[in-house]
Amino acid sequence: MIILITNDDGFESEGIRLLKEIAQNFASEVWIVAPDADRSGAARSLDYPVKQFIKISQHSEREFSVSGTPADCVIIALNKIMNKKPDLILSGVNIGSNVGDDICYSGTIGAAMEGAARSIPSIALSQVYHDKIDWNNTKIFAPKVIAKLMKVGWPKDIVMSINFPATEKVKGVEFAEQGEYNIDGDLTFTENLNGSLSLNWSREHSGSGSVDKIKGGFITITPIKLDFTDYDILNAMKNSCAEEFSSIANTPIASD
């Protein structure tokens, strides 16, 4: 098996080194193509359309850093660096959870989505922490969870997001929805001497889905769709609103 690893915390992150160790349990080849700096919060954004250039640095035969986003890294790995299509993409291990609205912001999730968009099985892995990061639960349980997922399989346009709790004892594995945060939370701005602002964002969870289960000591697995369409609302609007909107195209355009 050929595995491609990336992340959003950067090429030097502890999490990606741990993920390399984990991947070696399954793979004949492990490739790392990751951002050359921390790109947390990059989502599935791309740098190359704006920058027009990307720097690729080779660190060993199969390890590269890229001056771009996590999604850039996946695109460049598949189209420039690797000579074969990977069988699996692993993104992470992220420092901190990816639940609730984090999923929209996360470069870890974004990189996995880029892989899934190309019909490559893709898994995002995240380790919850409080004061200090402890990778123990990921180290122990990630190989087992990945192996089980690969055995049962899942649709190629779905990303599997795994979150590992920070609790001393893991109670089990749960399949769970992404959950919710209070989007406003406690937002604090501090003005620095140079006139810039430092931002601290503390959010409370709603007590649902992955957010609640992780806090209770469970590993969570959340399937994430590439297609954001709400088909229930779409069909309802087609049935109830189509005629209302059809008149727009028939409205005469006033001449100057």
Curated annotation (Swiss-Prot):
Binding of a divalent metal cation, residues: 8-9, 40, 94
Subcellular location: Cytoplasm
Pfam families (UniProt xref): SurE (PF01975)
InterPro entries: SurE (IPR030048), SurE-like_Pase/nucleotidase (IPR002828), SurE-like_sf (IPR036523)
Family annotation (NCBIfam families): PRK00346.1-4, surE
Family designation: Belongs to the SurE nucleotidase family.
Protein name: 5'-nucleotidase SurE
Species assigned in the record: Wolbachia pipientis subsp. Culex pipiens (strain wPip)
Gene encoding the protein: surE
